[in-house]
Swiss-Prot record:
The gene is HAT2. Regulatory subunit of the histone acetylase B (HAT-B) complex. The complex acetylates 'Lys-14' of histone H4 which is required for telomeric silencing. Signal peptide: none annotated. It holds the Pfam family CAF1C_H4-bd. WD repeats lie at residues 98-138, 141-181, 184-224, 228-268, 275-315, 332-372. This is Histone acetyltransferase type B subunit 2.
Amino acid sequence: MSEQPTEPLSIKEEYQLWRKNCRYMYEFVSETALMWPSLTIQWLPNYTTTNGLIDAKLLLGTHTSNQSANQLKVASTQLSADPNVKANSKIKTVQKLENNAEICRARYMPQDANIVATINGLGEVDLYNLDTETRYSHFAPHTKNGYGLSWNPKQKGLLVTGADDNFVCVTDTTTNKTTFKSDIQKDIVNDVKWHQFNGNLFASVSEDSHVYLFDARDNKVVSQYYAESSNGINSLAFSPFAENLVAIGNTSSNINLLDLRKLGENSGLLHTMMGHSEGITCMEFSPHHDGILATGSQDRRIIIWDLFKVGEEQQQEDAEDGCPELFMMHAGHTAGVSDLSWCPFKDWMIGSVADDNIVHLWEISKKLITNEEAEVDVSILE
């Protein structure tokens, strides 16, 4: 008799299978349920270590669907700094700061982590001082919902934003004056980021399937790329190690790697990575390891990619598990992933949030990393 096709697992069954295998993939995993879903997450860089425990904080937001006041939240958690000391890594809210609408993104200023910017569902930007627990500035560079929000890592106070009104704006937050506004995009702007090395360059991606690279000195487009088969571009990330590398995440579920030096309307594509089954929602390069990229998707998955594995030969059985650059898949969320953040002070730790109201904090198993980083003993090839 021929084998009957197996029924796909339900979301609940997938989750149970993931929980069963957690001990093989992670040093630890923490799950905390929120009252309201958070569309944003970011580790704060400041932490303290006492008696083998790290006291850390994260930025979160709320999306209450107008059933309650929306808030920027600061959450605290404990992580283990000593393998012999067990931490309770459930998070708890320690600060709540009100906002006029759901918070789509919240990001701290690189030069002063006590200053946090948010962009909300109305396209408004708010600036908060965590030390004084105040919202000290409010302006509206956009007229519609916005997800694009990025602080300039080189020039203090410069903030670039992008929103559903098709605009990209640069604001000097010391004066709240808009220094640049672009309407070259023909559709919703989904993400904006400053370049990691050059404080004058930033990029946007949008539903019109274009990447635009801007120069803030001239207020003009330096170059552009059209991702024809993307069905719209949702996210981008500049590499913190390779100044000419940018990654974009598409509605089509694919990730494109681009070379800024060769960027043109139909050129600059280095490689396309396939592993997700639905649109990409967020992405971030590891700040610790060159070539390591994390991507989140509507398919409820986060994939860790190792770009140095691109093009490696595979055995047939390995190829069935995915392309060589697919290092690891985090499959614990039960709804689309909204945002993710690499921990700035623990190499292989990520925080992630999804539409299921759950915050995940997870550290990749040292055994997986050791296998990934193991070098071939050349003596066995002689």
